[in-house]
Amino acid sequence: CCDRIACRFGCVPCCT
């Protein structure tokens, strides 16, 4: 999964 910062740039799924 992607880290929280990567999620902000559209990376999915996000780590929780």
UniProtKB/Swiss-Prot annotation:
List where in the cell it is found.
Secreted
Distribution of this protein across tissues and organs: Expressed by the venom duct.
Instruction: List, alphabetically, the GO terms of the cellular component aspect.
Output: extracellular region
GO molecular function annotation: toxin activity
Q: Which cysteines are joined by disulfide bonds?
A: C1-C15, C2-C11, C7-C14
The UniProt keyword set, sorted, is: Disulfide bond, Secreted, Toxin
Instruction: State the signal peptide span.
Output: none
Q: What is known of its domains?
A: The cysteine framework is III (CC-C-C-CC).
What's this protein's family per the entry?
A: Belongs to the conotoxin M superfamily.
Indicate what this protein is called per its UniProt record: Conotoxin ar3d
